[in-house]
From Swiss-Prot:
Its main location: cytoplasm. This is Phosphoribosyl-ATP pyrophosphatase 1. It is an enzyme of class 3 (hydrolase). Gene3D superfamilies: MazG-like. One of its GO terms (cellular component) is cytoplasm. Keywords: Amino-acid biosynthesis, ATP-binding, Cytoplasm, Histidine biosynthesis, Hydrolase, Nucleotide-binding. Disulfide bonds: none annotated. InterPro entries: HisE, PRib-ATP_PPHydrolase-like. HAMAP family: HisE.
């Protein structure tokens, strides 16, 4: 089975956003705006936490997949590329977690 990466998912979201069409859930989410996409992401985050607290491995994996999808849709809605998030993560790897947290603007 070929490996499906988060970059593959981002490319799929980009393609569906560009193609549009009534059958595209991605397009429907984006058409409702970034605020709606943020709400959906929040709902999925809560469902992911619940699955983790319940210690339900299969449910956590499924909700984690939903969470990643909705995060990427939210990024798309706000015009942010996955590579920008990766760059932010990359900057953090050069310092400890405590140093990174202290460097953030409140």
């Amino acid at each position: 089975m070929p490996r499906f990466t988060i970059h593959d998912l981002a490319e799929t979201i980009d393609a569906r956003a560009a193609a549009g069409g009534e059958g595209s859930y991605t397009r429907k989410l984006l058409d409702k705006g970034a605020e709606h996409c943020a709400k959906k992401f929040g709902e999925e985050a809560v469902e992911t936490v619940i699955a983790a607290v319940e210690n339900d491995r299969a449910h956590l994996i499924a909700e984690g997949a939903d969470l990643l999808y909705h995060f990427l849709v939210l990024l798309k809605a706000r015009g942010i590329k996955l590579e920008e998030v990766e760059a932010a993560l990359g900057k953090r790897t050069s310092m400890s977690g405590l140093e990174e947290k202290a460097s953030r603007k409140e």
